[in-house]
């Protein structure tokens, strides 16, 4: 689910944080991809009759089809993908997962009814809601990635947190996920829409956390941004009814921390009421110190290798009944691209030099002066406008 309305807030307050571009702009970059989110998106790409892609024997193959061809597309555009799978969910998330399972059970019953009485739109809508990524889906995807020579890791808990750790540790350029809580886990750069199909013609969104914080007037070192995300609504806690994005931002700006916000709500319960059990400090700690594999651990020493073409044919063609020509052509292309992947973009050769504290202070001072000058000018313009209005008109 991620963080409710966070993207909307970023669009309003930090538009400079979002860059849009084509997939080819990511050439030469290593990217950590939230595998579970990607697999889910492949599974919900149902056909017009509400059914997923299946083999001749009735097995679902949407996840394998999506993973194989989207990965080929990324490698074809010079990207080095690595996939991160979810581990066990944190205890706080179990309540949210139970609710999701209940919603899917209800949606499954509604989908069956829609097939009998509903429109095509009803069938598709409810079919999407019943989709669940299973252990078997994950195992098959990991088997496919191994045969393709694409590295992967199973996170101790949340895939998004592990992706963020790898990006922060310099193992990859960015974390790729549709879940906005990847930013809450402190990834410097988040890529969205990277695993979308080419037919959707959606641009790749590149969101820079430092610019997000700048627009929201928050510091990276303080947990204000995390507190804002929890208040907006995250996977760990029930949302507070009546708090939308604008209210959440105002509350955090006025009261600085969730402790301050909670005290304010408890002092006047006529307007807002906290859920009965709302352990926000535990949720904050999960974002601040998630259970992850450190970026410098041996498990995070990733290698991209040549694909096992015959192994791919055996798995995808013989077992899953994919078209052999398409699989062989894709595997040959993958092999060729892996060989030429040594060519890297300039960022790999020229590491950015860290600014000195004096340079940082100078830049901040200049930015503050610029802002002060802008406010002064606006004030003078407003004053002149007011004076012009108050002047009596002379008779012509």
From Swiss-Prot:
It is an enzyme of class 3 (hydrolase). GO terms for cellular component: cytoplasm; mitochondrion; nucleolus; nucleoplasm; nucleus. Residues 385-396 have a biased composition (Basic residues). It is found in: Nucleus, Nucleolus; Nucleus, Nucleoplasm; Mitochondrion. Residues 338-396 are annotated as: Disordered. Its EC number is 3.1.-.-. Its cofactor is Mg(2+). Phosphorylated. Phosphorylation upon DNA damage induces relocalization to the nuclear plasma. DNA binds at residues 47, 70, 158, 233, 235. Residues 342-350 are annotated as: Interaction with PCNA. Keywords: DNA damage, DNA repair, DNA replication, Endonuclease, Exonuclease, Hydrolase, Magnesium, Metal-binding, Mitochondrion, Nuclease, Nucleus, Phosphoprotein. InterPro entries: 5-3_exonuclease_C_sf, Flap_endonuc, HhH2, PIN-like_dom_sf, XPG-I_dom, XPG/Rad2, XPG_CS, XPG_DNA_repair_N. Mg(2+) 2 binds at residues 179, 181, 235. It holds the Pfam family XPG_I. Residues 122-255 are annotated as: I-domain. Binds 2 magnesium ions per subunit. They probably participate in the reaction catalyzed by the enzyme. May bind an additional third magnesium ion after substrate binding. Mg(2+) 1 binds at residues 34, 86, 158, 160. Residues 352-384 have a biased composition (Basic and acidic residues). Residues 1-104 are annotated as: N-domain. GO terms for molecular function: 5'-3' exonuclease activity; 5'-flap endonuclease activity; DNA binding; magnesium ion binding. One of its GO terms (biological process) is DNA replication, removal of RNA primer. HAMAP family: Fen. PANTHER family: FLAP ENDONUCLEASE 1, FLAP ENDONUCLEASE FAMILY MEMBER. Belongs to the XPG/RAD2 endonuclease family. FEN1 subfamily. This is Flap endonuclease 1. It comes from Phaeosphaeria nodorum (strain SN15 / ATCC MYA-4574 / FGSC 10173). The lineage of its organism: Eukaryota, Fungi, Dikarya, Ascomycota, Pezizomycotina.
């Amino acid at each position: 689910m991620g963080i409710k309305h966070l993207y909307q807030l970023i669009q309003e307050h930090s538009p400079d944080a979002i860059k849009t571009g084509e997939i080819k702009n990511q050439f030469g970059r290593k990217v950590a991809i939230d595998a579970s989110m990607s697999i889910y998106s492949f599974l919900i790409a149902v056909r017009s009759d509400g059914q997923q892609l299946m083999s001749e024997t009735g097995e679902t193959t949407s996840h394998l089809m999506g993973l194989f061809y989207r990965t080929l597309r990324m490698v074809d555009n010079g990207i080095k993908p690595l996939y991160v799978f979810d581990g066990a969910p944190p205890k706080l998330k179990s309540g949210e997962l139970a609710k999701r399972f209940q919603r899917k059970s209800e949606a499954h019953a509604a989908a069956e009814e829609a097939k009998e009485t509903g429109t095509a739109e009803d069938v598709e809508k409810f079919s999407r809601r019943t989709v669940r990524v299973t252990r078997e889906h994950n195992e098959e995807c990991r088997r496919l990635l191994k045969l393709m020579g694409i590295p992967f890791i199973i996170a101790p808990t949340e895939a998004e947190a592990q992706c963020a750790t790898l990006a922060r540790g310099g193992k990859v350029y960015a974390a790729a996920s549709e879940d906005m809580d990847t930013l809450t886990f402190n990834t410097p750069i988040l890529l969205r829409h990277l695993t979308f199909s080419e037919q959707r013609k959606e641009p790749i969104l590149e969101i820079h956390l430092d610019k997000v914080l700048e627009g929201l007037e928050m510091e990276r070192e303080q947990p204000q941004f995390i507190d804002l995300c929890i208040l907006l609504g995250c996977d760990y806690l029930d949302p507070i009814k009546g708090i939308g994005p604008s209210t959440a931002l105002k509350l955090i700006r006025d009261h600085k921390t969730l402790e301050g916000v909670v005290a304010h709500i408890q002092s006047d319960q006529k307007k807002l009421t906290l859920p009965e059990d709302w352990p926000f400090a535990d949720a904050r700690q999960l974002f601040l110190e998630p259970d992850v594999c450190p970026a410098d651990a041996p498990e995070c020493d990733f290698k991209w290798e040549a694909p096992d073409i015959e192994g791919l044919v055996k798995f995808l063609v013989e077992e899953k009944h994919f078209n052999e020509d398409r699989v062989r052509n894709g595997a040959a292309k993958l092999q060729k691209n892996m060989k030429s992947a040594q060519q890297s973009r300039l960022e790999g050769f020229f590491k950015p030099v860290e600014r000195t504290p004096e340079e940082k202070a100078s830049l901040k001072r200049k930015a503050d002066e610029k802002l002060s000058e802008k406010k002064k000018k606006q004030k003078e313009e407003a004053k002149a406008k007011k004076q012009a209005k108050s002047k009596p008109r002379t008779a012509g």
